[in-house]
Every structure is written in structure tokens, then in C-alpha cells.
From Swiss-Prot:
Entry function: Potential calcium sensor.
Protein's recorded name: Probable calcium-binding protein CML26
Organism: Arabidopsis thaliana (Mouse-ear cress)
Keywords: Acetylation, Calcium, Metal-binding, Repeat
Gene name per UniProt: CML26
Residues bound to Ca(2+) 4: D134, D136, D138, N140, E145
Gene3D superfamilies documented for this protein: EF-hand (1.10.238.10)
Annotated Pfam families: EF-hand_7
Modification N-acetylalanine occurs at: A2
Binding positions (Ca(2+) 1): D29, N31, D33, K35, E40
Length: 163
């Protein structure tokens, strides 16, 4: 059953996207054996200007290596590439709302950004919006809570529509 999700993910991409991912995968698969090893993964990160310890690389590999064979195959590589671009977009959106860069989004920060985007809502609406995702009860939205909010757009739409 787990492979069904991966297969449907692969079917939703265009052939050109698949070809681009294959080219990138082949570039990182230095020895051409069809899989990326820990050392090749280290070279991937170095090429992007980041270096990690072997322990950190092994942790990254463990997260990506769906079939637990100690390597990243092309399917696993494609899956992580697709999901990481989404994660980057969510991080960028969080940073947009986090006006004072303290790692938390307040109701007034949400209010300012939504109003700039042309959405009409009150600070009270934003407080209610935060209340739906504020699992730690601090009255703010941290990154984890923001991810939850972004994956449930009905929270935003419902709160703003009810104003």
C-alpha cells in the first residue's frame, strides 16, 4: 500500500520533470550504480554549499531511504525533491508572516499580512484562526503549527468568511 502513494506521486509529474530529476539523480550518483550512497549524498550537499558530519548524513539518509537498503534510489530521490520544494514554500510563507523574525507569528502579524494581501478580517478573526492551530496555548503560531494551518486551508477560509 505504501508504494501506491509513491506511484501516484510519480504519475502526477510531467515527463520533462521526471527527465530533469533523472538528470540530477544521475549527476549525484557519481559511480553510476543507480543509487546514492552516504558519501555521494555528502557530495550533493557540498555542491549546494553545505557540509554535514557523517552522523548527520546518516540521519538524512535514514529519513529519505524508504526501503531501508542504506541507499537513495531514484524513486526516493524524486519523492524527497518534490516534498522539499513544498517545505521550502511553507518556510518562505512562514517567514513572510513572521514580521519581527522571532520564530512566532502573532495575530497582529497575520492581520497585517492578510490585509496587505487584500483579505478583509479583524484581529479577532486572526486570534480565532490561531486558536484552531495553537497546540501549545501561547497565543502565537510556531512553524509546526503554521504547517498544520497551511495543510488545512479550510481553517483560514472558514475564519475569514465568518467575519
Amino acid at each position: 500500500m505504501a508504494n501506491t502513494n509513491l506511484e501516484s506521486t510519480n504519475k502526477s509529474t510531467t515527463p520533462s520533470t521526471d527527465m530533469e530529476l533523472k538528470k540530477v539523480f544521475d549527476k549525484f550518483d557519481a559511480n553510476g550504480d543507480g543509487k546514492i550512497s552516504v558519501s555521494e549524498l555528502g557530495n550533493v550537499f557540498k555542491s549546494m554549499g553545505t557540509s554535514y558530519t557523517e552522523e548527520e548524513l546518516n540521519r538524512v539518509l535514514d529519513e529519505i531511504d524508504i526501503d531501508c537498503d542504506g541507499f537513495i534510489n531514484q524513486e526516493e530521490f524524486a519523492t524527497i525533491c518534490r516534498s522539499s520544494s513544498s517545505a521550502v514554500e511553507i518556510r518562505e510563507a512562514f517567514d513572510l508572516y513572521d514580521q519581527n523574525k522571532n520564530g512566532l507569528i502573532s495575530s497582529s502579524e497575520i492581520h497585517k499580512v492578510l490585509n496587505r494581501l487584500g483579505m478583509t478580517c479583524s484581529v479577532e478573526d486572526c486570534v480565532r484562526m490561531i486558536g484552531h492551530v495553537d497546540t501549545d496555548g501561547d497565543g502565537n503560531v510556531n512553524f509546526e503549527e503554521f504547517q498544520k494551518m497551511m495543510s488545512s486551508p479550510e481553517l483560514v477560509k472558514g475564519t475569514v468568511a465568518n467575519s
